[in-house]
Amino acid sequence: MAAATGPSFWLGNETLKVPLALFALNRQRLCERLRKNPAVQAGSIVVLQGGEETQRYCTDTGVLFRQESFFHWAFGVTEPGCYGVIDVDTGKSTLFVPRLPASHATWMGKIHSKEHFKEKYAVDDVQYVDEIASVLTSQKPSVLLTLRGVNTDSGSVCREASFDGISKFEVNNTILHPEIVECRVFKTDMELEVLRYTNKISSEAHREVMKAVKVGMKEYELESLFEHYCYSRGGMRHSSYTCICGSGENSAVLHYGHAGAPNDRTIQNGDMCLFDMGGEYYCFASDITCSFPANGKFTADQKAVYEAVLRSSRAVMGAMKPGVWWPDMHRLADRIHLEELAHMGILSGSVDAMVQAHLGAVFMPHGLGHFLGIDVHDVGGYPEGVERIDEPGLRSLRTARHLQPGMVLTVEPGIYFIDHLLDEALADPARASFLNREVLQRFRGFGGVRIEEDVVVTDSGIELLTCVPRTVEEIEACMAGCDKAFTPFSGPK
């Protein structure tokens, strides 16, 4: 990213300096898109409400604040309790900040002026939240465009802006959501620089974890090391999601690390480790998974499963380019997994017939990847007209879109040996006929392997953002403490 000449977000030391021009450009993009929409009247004004501080249940213990994602995309504001207004016709932006009581200075620090926030966030005007109705009245908007829509990953409805006096205005809450979501799908050059940075720091942290892991450690010790590196070296106070540090059978638990299974197993000799962790900088995410043997040396079975997943990962990245349909990439990964599992003797028979029986979903029940940005599962996966495919595996895809330049996605194929899925397949004659029970038994308790990369779709291929050891030789060298150079995948760009 070119040196920022205007206001910027920066945490000092070697952290990334992010120009506030990034958000000014996002607001400009949104206005340009809205002006092209025939349903948008002249005199329309966008109203966004930022996130609010919360407490732990009924106590006064604060929960660390993280800005609401749409508001961050448009304004880059780190403080809670704010609103943002954008005049669609002119692009003029107004930030509304809370009017703080004098006691705030005692407990929380200096109370800043409106001019401070105007300079800090490079907006056209700053007013107080309690003035929002009167300020908007003076602007005489034809309609207020508020944000209401369903997140297609969570199924939850985003919070629509509301304030005292909003009932006096004409409000439309259907136009804005699809337009701002589509803006977020395509990253600007400045946004890509932040995502390169989150991947750089998180990749370095994964390499430190690989070097540090030892048999006898607790999984959470590696979670702690990862988060410490990201924060101390990268200024990442937040993680993009709860760290998944699965060893042994836990490596087949897709979202391990939750409160009921808090990365608390002791790592044992012979385990595979699957560590899915990503740091977040200024609300921009990363999402990286590394799989490796706990003792630093792959067994023959571990190597076979790992290299099967590596082959599918690289085949997908080599095939990605504008116009490619994402479900076809999932199917490509599935087919390669089935071919490799047959080569290992776990499966036998026609791979085409296995595909027809949806056997791939037994070993990879999740989708191949998802959009990445300000949210780790970023918005825009299923806009109007893009339907979810109701087939095993494919129904878990978080998007079924055709790839276009500027999209950022994860590529995360995996092979897992999940007992209840294997038992279901063995009880189903249509699938059991392909399974070699004796060989399969050897892999009960193996866990799983996932390889997850973050990539940008370019005009002719992809740019790989993640930079960690991936081949068996590279991983073993890294875990042995060697500083041997490794070459990340390089596909068409």
UniProtKB/Swiss-Prot annotation:
<dbReference type="Pfam" id="PF05195">
    <property type="entry name" value="AMP_N"/>
</dbReference>
<dbReference type="GO" id="GO:0004181">
    <property type="term" value="F:metallocarboxypeptidase activity"/>
</dbReference>
<dbReference type="GO" id="GO:0008233">
    <property type="term" value="F:peptidase activity"/>
</dbReference>
<keyword id="KW-0177">Collagen degradation</keyword>
<feature type="modified residue" description="Phosphoserine">
    <location>
        <position position="167"/>
    </location>
</feature>
<dbReference type="InterPro" id="IPR007865">
    <property type="entry name" value="Aminopep_P_N"/>
</dbReference>
<feature type="binding site">
    <location>
        <position position="276"/>
    </location>
    <ligand>
        <name>Mn(2+) 1</name>
    </ligand>
</feature>
<feature type="binding site">
    <location>
        <position position="287"/>
    </location>
    <ligand>
        <name>Mn(2+) 2</name>
    </ligand>
</feature>
<feature type="binding site">
    <location>
        <position position="287"/>
    </location>
    <ligand>
        <name>Mn(2+) 1</name>
    </ligand>
</feature>
<keyword id="KW-0482">Metalloprotease</keyword>
<feature type="binding site">
    <location>
        <position position="287"/>
    </location>
    <ligand>
        <name>a dipeptide</name>
    </ligand>
</feature>
<feature type="binding site">
    <location>
        <position position="452"/>
    </location>
    <ligand>
        <name>Mn(2+) 1</name>
    </ligand>
</feature>
<comment type="subunit">
    <text>Homodimer.</text>
</comment>
<feature type="modified residue" description="N-acetylalanine">
    <location>
        <position position="2"/>
    </location>
</feature>
<feature type="binding site">
    <location>
        <position position="452"/>
    </location>
    <ligand>
        <name>Mn(2+) 2</name>
    </ligand>
</feature>
<keyword id="KW-0464">Manganese</keyword>
<feature type="binding site">
    <location>
        <position position="412"/>
    </location>
    <ligand>
        <name>Mn(2+) 2</name>
    </ligand>
</feature>
<dbReference type="GO" id="GO:0102009">
    <property type="term" value="F:proline dipeptidase activity"/>
</dbReference>
<comment type="similarity">
    <text>Belongs to the peptidase M24B family. Eukaryotic-type prolidase subfamily.</text>
</comment>
<keyword id="KW-0597">Phosphoprotein</keyword>
<keyword id="KW-0479">Metal-binding</keyword>
<dbReference type="GO" id="GO:0006520">
    <property type="term" value="P:amino acid metabolic process"/>
</dbReference>
<dbReference type="InterPro" id="IPR000994">
    <property type="entry name" value="Pept_M24"/>
</dbReference>
<feature type="binding site">
    <location>
        <position position="377"/>
    </location>
    <ligand>
        <name>a dipeptide</name>
    </ligand>
</feature>
<feature type="binding site">
    <location>
        <position position="255"/>
    </location>
    <ligand>
        <name>a dipeptide</name>
    </ligand>
</feature>
<keyword id="KW-0224">Dipeptidase</keyword>
<keyword id="KW-0225">Disease variant</keyword>
<dbReference type="Pfam" id="PF00557">
    <property type="entry name" value="Peptidase_M24"/>
</dbReference>
<keyword id="KW-0378">Hydrolase</keyword>
<protein>
    <recommendedName>
        <fullName>Xaa-Pro dipeptidase</fullName>
        <ecNumber>3.4.13.9</ecNumber>
    </recommendedName>
</protein>
<dbReference type="InterPro" id="IPR029149">
    <property type="entry name" value="Creatin/AminoP/Spt16_N"/>
</dbReference>
<keyword id="KW-0007">Acetylation</keyword>
<comment type="function">
    <text>Dipeptidase that catalyzes the hydrolysis of dipeptides with a prolyl (Xaa-Pro) or hydroxyprolyl residue in the C-terminal position. The preferred dipeptide substrate is Gly-Pro, but other Xaa-Pro dipeptides, such as Ala-Pro, Met-Pro, Phe-Pro, Val-Pro and Leu-Pro, can be cleaved. Plays an important role in collagen metabolism because the high level of iminoacids in collagen.</text>
</comment>
<dbReference type="InterPro" id="IPR001131">
    <property type="entry name" value="Peptidase_M24B_aminopep-P_CS"/>
</dbReference>
<dbReference type="InterPro" id="IPR052433">
    <property type="entry name" value="X-Pro_dipept-like"/>
</dbReference>
<feature type="binding site">
    <location>
        <position position="398"/>
    </location>
    <ligand>
        <name>a dipeptide</name>
    </ligand>
</feature>
<dbReference type="GO" id="GO:0030145">
    <property type="term" value="F:manganese ion binding"/>
</dbReference>
<feature type="binding site">
    <location>
        <position position="370"/>
    </location>
    <ligand>
        <name>Mn(2+) 2</name>
    </ligand>
</feature>
<dbReference type="GO" id="GO:0043069">
    <property type="term" value="P:negative regulation of programmed cell death"/>
</dbReference>
<dbReference type="GO" id="GO:0030574">
    <property type="term" value="P:collagen catabolic process"/>
</dbReference>
<dbReference type="GO" id="GO:0006508">
    <property type="term" value="P:proteolysis"/>
</dbReference>
<dbReference type="GO" id="GO:0070062">
    <property type="term" value="C:extracellular exosome"/>
</dbReference>
